[in-house]
Amino acid sequence: GENYWSGVIMLNVVLSCFLLLLVPVVGVGQNSPGPGIFALRTMLQDKDPEIRTKAAEGLGRVGGRESVLILRQGLTDPSLEVRISVIEALGFIGGRLAITVISEALKDNSVEVRIRAVEALVDAGTVSSIPVIQKAFGDKEESVRLHAALMLRRIGHRLTVPVLGDVVLVDKSPTVRAAAAEYLGKVGVKNLRAVGFLAKALEDKSPTVRIRAIESLGFIQLKQAIAVLEKGLQDSDPGVRIRATEVMGHVLAKDFE
């Protein structure tokens, strides 16, 4: 009844205050963790999943190598919510060690956890996380691979071009291939390799993938892209030809204005 819920609320209040008190204590001298961080490690093993979640959040605020190593133990927690909190905390801490630990969560049996892991990788290291995000394209779930492509788009670095290019060519899902083709137009501006990948994408059996490739060629801003666009004008699908005609008009107008 009311007594139970008031007790739960009081526990949360006390726990939150305790965590706030711990953070400044532990934050002094990352190389020599104080007793506070060991208290958080103990709380991460508490029988109550809500306390374990709060402990993960606290470790994320504390940061440092010791917190990352403690959080790693939480990747095998039976609670989905706790594992997600652990991954988010690792993303918040960031750095190479955190990226390595987050990469282990790409094997989690929960699709939601694997998606959160891909997101946390971007938070943890942006460009340095690209090779690890690339591993997520081996996931059997389309939603995880779609999310990995979106995260590469968010990073936006030229190093994402060959990764997205490979996805355009080899992923078994036309939805994922189409997304990768679309994002190539955003990350591959004035990038000749992006033009090469998009040229090959025009041979894809899915008209949607070919349309996304044509739209991306319109953003590349290289004369070589115009030559590839001309191939789209000869496509067997009328929808693709119409889109190629529209994009070619926009590109030429910008080119010669």
Regions found by a protein language model. Name each.
Residues K47-D48, P78-S79, N109-S110, K140-E141, ...:
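Short inter-helical turns and helix N-cap capping residues of alpha-solenoid HEAT/ARM repeat scaffolds
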Residues D48-E88:
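N-terminal, post-signal-peptide region of Sec/Tat-exported proteins
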Residues L59, G63, L90, G94, ...:
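Alpha-solenoid repeat junctions
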Residues N12-P24:
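Bacterial N-terminal signal peptides
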Residues G27-R61:
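N-terminal leader/linker segments that initiate helical-solenoid repeat arrays
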Residues N31-M43, G64-T76, G95-K107, T126-G138, ...:
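Amphipathic alpha-helical scaffolding segments comprising HEAT/armadillo-like alpha-solenoid repeats
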